[in-house]
């Protein structure tokens, strides 16, 4: 299946954010994504790569790496909310259910709290497949300020 191109980059500055702002990303997990993630990370657990092995597990089929699914959250943070220039500080992850090859993951990131004196945002993060939450948690990010010297660390695209 051909994936649509990634959404254009968008930088939001701390001053642009408000509690409740939300961004979403939909991604269908391809077998090639899982193989590529295994090659990139070195995690070659056969539950991800071997249909024969996976068939003998409780999942009955190959599943995506949990951190592959979590990396889709990073895609939202780095490209849309807040976008380029934001720096990850921390991330909690709760893995609730497996993600299988062919599943479409819907990633939702919502601004939950803003700390003005440090230009930090707490973001509620959730991944769903077919209406079921498969991963949730929260992220803290440092967000560029429009009032900082040099103003724009990256251009708005």
Q: What is the meaning of each model-derived region?
A:
Residues 1-19, 99-157:
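HotDog/MaoC-like acyl-thioester-processing domains
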Residues 39-43, 78-82, 129:
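Short, intrinsically disordered, mixed-charge
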Residues 37, 73, 79, 156-157:
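Terminal targeting signals and extreme-terminal segments of soluble enzymes
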Residues 35, 52, 88, 92, ...:
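Residue-level detector of alpha-helical recognition elements and their boundaries
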Residues 2-64:
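Catalytic strand-loop segment that frames the active site of acyl-thioester-processing enzymes
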Residues 24-28, 94, 140-142:
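Generic structural detector for well-ordered beta-strands
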Residues 55-64, 68-108:
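Hydrophobic beta-strand-centered segment that forms part of the acyl-chain substrate-binding groove
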């Amino acid at each position: 299946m051909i994936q649509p191109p990634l959404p254009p980059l968008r930088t939001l500055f701390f001053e642009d954010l408000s509690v409740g702002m939300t961004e979403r990303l939909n991604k269908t997990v391809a077998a090639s994504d899982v193989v590529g993630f295994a090659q990139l990370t070195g995690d070659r657990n056969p539950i991800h790569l071997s249909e024969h092995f996976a068939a003998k597990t409780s999942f009955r089929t190959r599943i995506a790496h949990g951190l592959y699914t979590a990396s889709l959250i990073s895609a939202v943070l780095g490209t849309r909310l807040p976008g380029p220039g934001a720096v990850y500080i921390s991330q909690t992850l709760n893995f609730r259910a497996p993600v299988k090859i062919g599943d479409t993951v819907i990633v939702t990131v919502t601004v939950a709290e803003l700390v003005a004196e440090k230009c930090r945002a707490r973001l509620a993060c959730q991944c769903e497949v077919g209406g079921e939450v498969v991963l949730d948690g929260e992220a803290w990010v440092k967000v560029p300020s429009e009032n900082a010297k040099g103003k724009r660390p990256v251009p708005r695209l």
